[in-house]
Amino acid sequence: GTKCNAQGYKVSWNGYKLHLDTADCGVPIAALLSSASMHDSRAAIPLSLISAQRVTNLYDVMDAAYCSFELHEHCRSLGHVPLIDHNPRKGEKEAFEPADAVRYNERTVAERSNARLKDEFGANNVRVQGGTKVMGHLMFGVLALSADQLMRLRQ
């Protein structure tokens, strides 16, 4: 797919994208593989349903790309509190309450997990083709990341 970025340049991509849901300690809970052209917010509901089957959590913390009424309602239907950064579409940005802002800052753990998966566990250099092979390659990285995070928790 191709789109224009904020500076007006065309940005292209091909292949696949891994959507990862992590616990607040950085351990991956659920993963979905999608086409690289699919917007992140379209994977949020299926990913949250998989996570809800595996763990019990209170908060769903997401960045501004996931700001939609449907996603807020879905989070509430699962009994979760949605902490989704507001995307100010032709309006003002809504700020979090102080306690929610502290909880929202925990999102850096998920960003760190994604970065570690790319940098340390091979997700940045996938040299296989086909969805099944790509998913297998990435799942070995997710497995290694999970084991590493669990070992760090023991220390």
Which stretches of residues belong to each language-model region?
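Catalytic-loop motifs flanking and including active-site residues across diverse enzymes
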Residues: A43, V109, S113, M139, ...
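Helix-centered, glycine/charged polyanion-binding patches within enzymatic domains
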Residues: Y59, A64-T132
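Polybasic low-complexity intrinsically disordered regions
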Residues: G1-S77
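Charge-patterned, long linear interaction tracts outside catalytic cores
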Residues: Q129-Q155
